[in-house]
Curated annotation (Swiss-Prot):
This is Putative F-box protein At3g10240. CDD domains: F-box_AtFBW1-like (cd22157). Residues 21-66 form the F-box domain. It holds the Pfam family FBA_3. Residues 9-21 have a biased composition (Basic residues). The lineage of its organism: Eukaryota, Viridiplantae, Streptophyta, Embryophyta, Tracheophyta. Residues 1-26 are annotated as: Disordered.
Length: 389
């Protein structure tokens, strides 16, 4: 009995000595993974440098996919001179105050800025797609990860034109992002496609089957592995909805539900694509045209609550920016100076809440631009630890 106990102690000592000599952590790697998943994205990126095993964990596709299942956030950006300011706020209801509790938040979360040239083109040409955003600076196409603050400059597509419309898609089956681009100055039956993360960053030519051109200000919308954008088909002299299956790289043409829809506003409504009608319905509401199965459309009317709560909150001063995954409509001030207002409206509960951003800009920028700044909003943004290095 004593000999068995002695052997057990010797084996325990040998295991401990082995761990000590190897210098490895005594924390099991699966527990390390659980701990890292509970940390903010900034901390995850920082702990990547602790050791090779930790770096391996945070760059594994499985770990990266788990990060995207966290509660989505509202990503906020604006450009002032050569500085590009970035912040984000949670979307879940517990964070905000209702209308009958007048309250303003004055501190932003993780505000930082990046330097860009004055030649930075219209922003943003794409939405946030599984944590990544693509935009254009001068003649360069750039993929941006707001979580890691990394930028990836893509090779220039063939052709001399800089007049490009850019789309970003994500295939949830294979876990791949793809960048699409086409010229908007003329009609074409081809599109250029590049797969991120491939060994060779090469643009491929994909046939669209229908000669069309997209609108420069159309950022498209990627939903369940399909990128949608509104396009003009010259041969038919009609505006249509084009779909691009990210995995199969096949285009399809879908008839629009009405000729009177906003051509620059596409929305993810409960996991389905929706267009916003231009017509004014009863009580200043909005009409959504929702794409159903077999490319059929249904319509749904929503009350626009702003003018009913406060007459000074005209819908002309606020823009519809989409829906949260919880079904709330997001309104954002079209222009702001030192503070910006964001409103959330739940049409089912008939409740509203607001978030006021104070101190978003420095005094020097407020004084230098009397017309104000445009706040770019990315609903349902998820964290991503995809690395470009």
């Amino acid at each position: 009995m004593e000999q068995q106990e002695e052997k057990r102690k010797i084996k325990a000592y040998q295991r401990k000595s082995k761990r000590s000599k190897s210098g490895s952590s005594s924390i099991p790697l699966d527990l390390v993974s659980e701990i890292l998943l509970r940390l903010p994205e900034k901390s995850v990126a920082r702990f990547r440098c602790v050791s090779k095993p930790w770096s391996s964990i945070t760059t594994e596709p499985y770990f990266i996919n788990l990060l995207t299942t966290r509660s989505p956030r509202l990503l906020l950006c604006f450009k002032a001179n050569e500085k590009f300011f970035v912040s984000s706020i949670p979307q879940h209801r517990q964070t905000f105050e209702t209308w009958n509790k007048s309250h303003s938040y004055s501190q932003l979360i993780d505000r930082y800025h990046m330097e860009f040239s004055e030649e930075m083109n219209y922003f943003p040409p794409t939405e946030s797609v599984n944590g990544l955003i693509c935009f254009q600076e001068s003649a360069r196409l750039i993929v941006w990860n707001p979580s890691t603050r990394q930028l990836l400059i893509l090779p220039k597509p063939n052709g001399n034109s800089n007049d490009l419309t850019i789309f970003l898609g994500y295939d949830p089956v294979e876990g791949k992002h793809k960048v699409m681009c086409m010229e908007f100055s003329a009609t074409y039956d081809t599109c250029r496609v590049l797969t991120l993360g491939s060994a060779q960053k090469l643009w491929r030519t994909v046939k669209t089957h229908n000669k069309h051109r997209s609108d420069y200000y159309d950022s498209g919308r990627c939903i369940n592995g399909v990128v949608y954008h509104i396009a003009y088909v010259k041969d038919m002299c009609v505006w249509v909805l084009m779909s691009f299956d990210v995995r199969s790289e096949i285009f399809d043409m879908i008839e629009l539900p009405s000729s009177d829809v906003h051509k620059d506003v596409l929305i993810d409504y409960n996991g389905r694509l929706a267009c916003v009608g231009r017509e004014i319905i009863e009580k200043n509401g909005i009409r959504l045209w929702i794409l159903e199965k077999h490319n059929k459309w249904s319509s749904k009317d929503f009350l626009a609550p702003l003018v009913h709560i406060d007459k000074s909150l005209s819908t002309n001063k606020f823009l519809l920016k989409g829906f949260t995954h919880a079904g709330e409509i997001i309104y954002v001030e079209s222009m702001f100076h030192k503070s910006a207002k964001i409103f959330f409206y739940d049409p089912v509960r008939n409740t509203s809440r607001r978030f006021e951003l104070k101190g978003f800009t420095d005094d020097e920028f407020v004084l230098s631009n009397e017309h104000g700044y445009t706040l770019h909003v990315f609903p349902n943004h998820v964290e991503s630890q995809i690395s470009f290095t």
